[in-house]
Amino acid sequence: MTPHVMKRDGCKVPFKSERIKEAILRAAKAAEVDDADYCATVAAVVSEQMQGRNQVDINEIQTAVENQLMSGPYKQLARAYIEYRHDRDIEREKRGRLNQEIRGLVEQTNASLLNENANKDSKVIPTQRDLLAGIVAKHYARQHLLPRDVVQAHERGDIHYHDLDYSPFFPMFNCMLIDLKGMLTQGFKMGNAEIEPPKSISTATAVTAQIIAQVASHIYGGTTINRIDEVLAPFVTASYNKHRKTAEEWNIPDAEGYANSRTIKECYDAFQSLEYEVNTLHTANGQTPFVTFGFGLGTSWESRLIQESILRNRIAGLGKNRKTAVFPKLVFAIRDGLNHKKGDPNYDIKQLALECASKRMYPDILNYDQVVKVTGSFKTPMGCRSFLGVWENENGEQIHDGRNNLGVISLNLPRIALEAKGDEATFWKLLDERLVLARKALMTRIARLEGVKARVAPILYMEGACGVRLNADDDVSEIFKNGRASISLGYIGIHETINALFGGEHVYDNEQLRAKGIAIVERLRQAVDQWKEETGYGFSLYSTPSENLCDRFCRLDTAEFGVVPGVTDKGYYTNSFHLDVEKKVNPYDKIDFEAPYPPLANGGFICYGEYPNIQHNLKALEDVWDYSYQHVPYYGTNTPIDECYECGFTGEFECTSKGFTCPKCGNHDASRVSVTRRVCGYLGSPDARPFNAGKQEEVKRRVKHLGNGQIG
């Protein structure tokens, strides 16, 4: 029986004795040994040794050749063969993918790697160190950790194994809601310091910044603090009591007025410091923490003060140029009877949120009733759009804080449609096959966390960030079971999928095509519900943000299928279920088009609208917000807030495939402009940290959503 040879890259090829003979002859020529018969004999002996086996490793063959040569009469030939093998290994390594990617990083020539994440400044050493570690982690995971069919599917672009530079090499998870309340009230240990419950709002926000930095260094996705205004309200009370006590000790006549004034100032300063801290931090991942603050539901005066402080600081901007802060992402909750309409007690806070959104794009809004309807309970998204389902502890209490998402695998839907060649039945068959593969890939994320001990991430598992206080040698996997954690199937390109399958009319303009798009997402939802039932894990459907993926999938599909009109011709794929960015509709109709999808993909979603400058037309923006309240759970506002520090222009810079330029003076010096765009769910500063080519093209093609006589 002739064996198969397992090569270094994992491929299997038929065994051929001729290749052994050729390698020995090349070494013989280098050693000036003129004995072809001897070389043929050695090759024959080694071939005989390999017979009868199913599979042999390439290194076994080479070692057998070396042993045979060293026992023969030509020692110089043995030496030449060993040197030849060594030189070949070095040359192969230089040509290898790992070496090429490292060289692309060191020489700053690999644009796709350098611009993969708009939040990472690949020009600085800490980020380069993280990128280098990521290159190695990806390589090792592909070669040694993941099943071969999963790796091949990822490489082809059938699926995308997100964050392969971190997981599964490291036992890390994606995003989470920090149990900040538990940590601050019970105390915790961080590094060498024992942290006691803070005695003021300024101390509480300082500690919060350190918690964010630590947590963000132990996970690879977004870090969210849910209902931060309510969590930190007791520390505002503590500050007030401290200032009141000072006033009484010093016999200040209006002790209450003094305490109020000092508390307002301290709270504003505390959240200013927190915003600066977040935007100047670099985590161990080489980036500013992807952090989100959810707020808006608090009714106490302390919670209201926190809400105002967060919004007024964001409006004020960062530094001498008052730049728009990219982080934290702000998510403002709106609830009827609280802050939704005139007469509601916190309606004034909503007005401040509208002003902030018109000037700084954030906050995005969470519509309370819709969030509960779609996800089962109210909570802030983890990161930019990942939503947890309902989970109750042993006491029957709904718990959100301390929970997390284990990771995402995304499907390339347009590729399936292209492979189906317009045949809908073939599409559904291929989709079911890909779903089997996606589930297998997702299960590797779960398996990677089995047997992992709490000591690998004390801040998460031992000090309360995950809502638990485990011992160092406790297994962490138990806290991810029974739906406590989510794990998500993602998808991209509903728009291109419909085009590839049916062509012709735009999906927006055809009710039947709309129904086809919804049906695809319904099938994905059925799959994750089935997986959840079968495994007990919290499988969910997630509308992938696709900052990098919009470019990668399209690039791979263009190489495979060519430039296909309406599919691969733009250089990017449309984000999840979103309306084509070039389709000119009003914001209300865009909401209506996208509204059917969040209830299906309730593990992750966002809707947004593109607007002109609306700083002097807040009523128009409020009208859209109010419309969204009845239709979608989560809504974002994109509006031009670019600034030129050369000529003073404010508004929207010209977006080209090469970058952004001031329309007034032509300035495109990144150090003399401020450009802010929504990357996916987060904002980014593409002037300083460029988007990848596909995302840049998508941003360039975005049109404003105008109409109904309200906007524009």
From Swiss-Prot:
Outcome after substituting C665A: Loss of activity
Protein name as catalogued: Anaerobic ribonucleoside-triphosphate reductase
Catalytic activity annotation: a ribonucleoside 5'-triphosphate + formate + H(+) = a 2'-deoxyribonucleoside 5'-triphosphate + CO2 + H2O; formate + ATP + H(+) = dATP + CO2 + H2O; CTP + formate + H(+) = dCTP + CO2 + H2O; GTP + formate + H(+) = dGTP + CO2 + H2O
Function (record text): Catalyzes the conversion of ribonucleotides into deoxyribonucleotides, which are required for DNA synthesis and repair. Can reduce each of the four common ribonucleoside triphosphates.
Gene: nrdD
Record keywords, A-Z: Allosteric enzyme, ATP-binding, Metal-binding, Nucleotide-binding, Organic radical, Oxidoreductase, Zinc
An annotated GO BP: 2'-deoxyribonucleotide biosynthetic process
Binding annotation for Zn(2+): C644, C647, C662, C665
Domain remarks: Modulators bind to two classes of sites, one that binds ATP and dATP and regulates pyrimidine ribonucleotide reduction ('pyrimidine site'), the other that binds dATP, dGTP, and dTTP and regulates purine ribonucleotide reduction ('purine site').
Annotated GO CC locations: anaerobic ribonucleoside-triphosphate reductase complex
Entry-linked CDD domains: RNR_III
